Amino acid sequence: MADWLLYYTDPVYDAAFSLVTESPLLLSHDSDVRILFQLWLNLTVLGAILYLAGASVNFYFFFDQETLKHPKMLKNQVRREIYLSLESLPYTAIVTVPWFYFELKGYSKLYDTLDSWWEIPGAMLGFFLFTDCLVYWIHRGFHHPSVYWWLHKPHHTWKVCTPYSALAFHWLDGYGQSCPAHLYVYLFPMWKPLYMVSFVALQLWSISIHDGIYISNDEILLSCAHHTIHHLEFNYNFGQYTTLWDRIGGSYKKPVQEFANEMYFDKLKRKKEALLHGKVDGGDVGGKQKTGPIATTISAVAAEGMKARRGF
């Protein structure tokens, strides 16, 4: 994948560098200085584009805007989330570059030619099972008191999340939880286009589990409902895609009944039925709308978490 990042952006860098220097360190495609700089800037810019595009589409088209009125929502939270995310990306890119550099030098097991389409499901399953396991233990490790306060606590500033919360963390936190995805292709063979798709899917999944849209209350799939509990109660649901490792590690907590009543498609159905009867969810048409259902649900979970911590 690193070779694609360089090949398709080489003309842009050639034109830019030729305007300011004649040094072969920046003009030669074989120069390590040029390669490292180009990889770093590409990762920073593409990471920002993917984050802003994915989170913005989710925020403006799917996210329940009533959640912004929740009392646990911080002042200017969305702006602060975006700022922290974009501030962290260049630093995350610096420590991520070596993975791509050594891939370029032939140390990874990525390959260009697909021999059989049957390779795809096996590789995808392996990738997601591998990363699900390692991300769980890395994430749980970041909750250890020795590192939590400076490394992972910035991400838990957001008790009530928005899609922009997905990458709003300390740069080393983001890097640590991305390492399993990079490590996988150094241990197991994978087709380059599939790796790229899987990597993008991983980023979009991270956005989806912070968006407050409860599509699933499944016992196996770890959804936004599970991750909302993690942000509110801290010591549960560390997993990324499934509840498997939370169950093994004794940190699984099933979403409370309020979540089951707020599944996304059920809400759409109820809202449609309400509109047919001249009402909208949360208040009469044209009237003053009440607190949104997601905000109400979050309040219920927060209250339950407080009771649990106090021993009630």
Could you tell me what each predicted segment is?
Residues 70, 79, 94-130:
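Juxtamembrane helix-loop-helix connectors linking adjacent transmembrane helices
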Residues 87-96, 103, 172-185:
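Core segments of transmembrane alpha-helices
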Residues 54-63, 96-104, 135-143, 185, ...:
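Membrane-water interface at transmembrane helix exits
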Residues 117-156, 165-166, 178:
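Function-critical hydrophobic alpha-helical transmembrane segments in multi-pass membrane proteins
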Residues 29-92:
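Alpha-helical transmembrane segments in multi-pass membrane proteins
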Residues 36-44, 86, 121-125, 175, ...:
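Hydrophobic alpha-helical transmembrane segments
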Residues 47, 51, 124-135, 181, ...:
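Alpha-helical transmembrane segments of multi-pass membrane proteins
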Residues 1-37, 60-74, 145-312:
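Cytosolic/stromal cytosol-facing helical appendages immediately following the last transmembrane segment
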